[in-house]
Regions:
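Surface/interface-facing alpha-helical segments and adjacent flexible terminal/loop regions used
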Residues: 2-216
Length: 216
């Protein structure tokens, strides 16, 4: 099989996986991907431009998206980089430590990280070669949820498996983290990111609850 044939086969498989995912789930995955992207590194000029084109509805989440849009329009890449560094890097450590282990145990690289790594192996997830952060950081977990929903590393996983991963690795602490991000002293643009993240987590919790009740 030629390289071109393999590429075309991969593209057909990718299209099939996308067709197996509902529009609602694609929207969920898009939000998880967005949060992962904006929390992984400082928003650059391109991302800020994209964020300034966002649009929200009259829901609480939609209003938070509109606020993020307005803040993005007046934000500059250099100021966002400074804000990001104060929040997550700092001198010695940033204002926030966005890791499941820290939020759940008070320490880094603890049992929550070990449990996540085991589940990643079972689900066929792996850390990118150019990522050196512990896998239980909030950006990576957002990206993992998106990958599970759309089947980026295979077939889309069932809602039950999504719920299990969410309940174990995200629900216990992500809402708390996003609330802290909203209120952090250094947060300007990222305060709006925190609002979007917190409200989205609340929606996911409720949606998973309703789904579990229907299947009970």
């Amino acid at each position: 099989m030629s390289r071109q044939d393999r590429i075309e086969m991969d593209e057909r498989m990718d299209l099939k996986q996308k067709s197996d995912v509902s529009q609602e789930d694609r929207s969920r995955a898009d939000m998880y991907n967005f949060l992962g992207l904006v929390l992984a590194r400082p928003a650059d000029e391109i991302l800020l431009e994209q964020m300034s084109q966002l649009s929200g509805d009259q829901s609480e989440l939609g209003k938070a998206v509109e606020t993020l849009k307005r803040v993005s329009k007046v934000s500059k890449p250099n100021s966002v980089k400074i804000e990001f560094n104060k929040l997550f890097i700092g001198v010695g450590r940033g204002e926030l430590l966005p890791y499941a282990s820290y939020y759940l145990t008070g320490f880094l690289n603890e049992k929550p990280l070990a449990a996540l790594r085991r589940d990643m192996v079972n689900l066929g997830l792996s850390r990118a070669n150019n990522v050196y952060e512990p896998e239980d950081n909030i950006a990576s977990l957002m990206e993992m949820m998106a990958a599970l929903i759309v089947g980026r590393f295979g077939s889309p996983v069932s809602l039950g498996k999504q719920l299990k991963f969410f309940d174990k690795h995200i629900r216990p602490w992500a809402g708390h983290f996003f609330t802290d991000l909203e209120a952090a002293e250094s947060s300007i643009l990222y305060a709006s990111v925190g609002s979007v993240g917190r409200l989205f987590m609340e929606i996911e919790v409720e949606a998973f609850r309703m789904s579990a009740e229907k299947s009970a």
